[in-house]
Amino acid sequence: MLLAPGDVIKRSSEELKQRQIQINLIDWIESESGKEDKAEPKEESKAEESKDGQGTQSESSQKKEGSKEAKDADVDRRIHTAVGSGSSAKGPGVRANENVDRGDGKVGGGGGNADAGVGTIGANGGRWVVLTEEIARAIESKYGTKIDVYRDKVPAQIIEVERSLQKELGISREGVAEQTERLRDLRRKEKSGAHAKAAERGRRKQGKKPHGDVQKEGTEEEKTSEEQASVGIAIEGVMSQKKLLSMIGGVERKMAPIGARESAVMLVSNSIKDVVRATAYFTAPTGDPHWKEVAREASKKKNILAYTSTGGDVKTEFLHLIDHL
């Protein structure tokens, strides 16, 4: 059993139902004065069990339930639009539908096989690369396209994954920081290389002008040096999924729902009463006023595993944890 903040459970309710995982949600309602009303427990059974006991609900409670579900669905839609979370936005290593195209050129575009980096050829004939292993794994997991990591070779065409796409791919803060550091190193090297070439040209101008074949040889060497400098490293910032796919090929994978039989998690809850039987808890920034107390009690239990959000998309991290416990 997994404990989690109530708002995280709410936002993930549809995916939890797909996995046939039970929900025990202690809900909270804020009055017009801003004070919290009495907490209301709410339980949702597995899909096959949810049919029992429905006849005893009053008409007013059914209306309340329906309006709440519509509100939750609307929240999910807004989140999906903003950061691309949901069942199709898993982190690296999640289970994927075996029938998804692996990048053989029939669906995702770009010939060749996935291991060869299908669809990653840049405008100048070189292949697009990324700056970190985490970004490469996230792209392969989400789009089925294998992409290489930059290995300090010139020339190179590098994809810089910008903020909105970082969220879409579920890149951690550490992964973002690693990309930033590598970009700084590249620009520093590029700047120092440009200064060195300028100094070399200055020394040549100050020296004696060569004659005959020597002059011809010197001109050719300078021309070759300028050509190498013009090739160098190209860095392309990418903000949207659409642009990324046009550069690397592939299509977004549709993840198969993971059932309760495939996950060790059978129940998720934000109730303090469930601390005694919980095996793990997931904590993240939350608006659930009861969660702080629940997490404090859970942290006192030596047999409960603790998991914390890394700062990425919380819903994606929560579902990823459930699928791998």
From Swiss-Prot:
<dbReference type="InterPro" id="IPR001399">
    <property type="entry name" value="Orbi_VP6"/>
</dbReference>
<protein>
    <recommendedName>
        <fullName>Protein VP6-B</fullName>
    </recommendedName>
</protein>
<feature type="compositionally biased region" description="Basic and acidic residues">
    <location>
        <begin position="210"/>
        <end position="226"/>
    </location>
</feature>
<comment type="function">
    <text>Surrounds and interacts with the genomic dsRNA. Possesses ss- and dsRNA-binding capacity. Its hydrophilic nature and capability to bind ss- and dsRNA suggest that it interacts with BTV genomic RNA.</text>
</comment>
<comment type="similarity">
    <text>Belongs to the orbivirus VP6 family.</text>
</comment>
<feature type="compositionally biased region" description="Basic and acidic residues">
    <location>
        <begin position="32"/>
        <end position="52"/>
    </location>
</feature>
<dbReference type="GO" id="GO:0005198">
    <property type="term" value="F:structural molecule activity"/>
</dbReference>
<feature type="region of interest" description="Disordered">
    <location>
        <begin position="23"/>
        <end position="123"/>
    </location>
</feature>
<keyword id="KW-0946">Virion</keyword>
<feature type="region of interest" description="Disordered">
    <location>
        <begin position="176"/>
        <end position="229"/>
    </location>
</feature>
<dbReference type="Pfam" id="PF01516">
    <property type="entry name" value="Orbi_VP6"/>
</dbReference>
<feature type="compositionally biased region" description="Basic and acidic residues">
    <location>
        <begin position="61"/>
        <end position="79"/>
    </location>
</feature>
<dbReference type="GO" id="GO:0019028">
    <property type="term" value="C:viral capsid"/>
</dbReference>
<feature type="compositionally biased region" description="Basic and acidic residues">
    <location>
        <begin position="176"/>
        <end position="201"/>
    </location>
</feature>
<feature type="compositionally biased region" description="Gly residues">
    <location>
        <begin position="106"/>
        <end position="123"/>
    </location>
</feature>
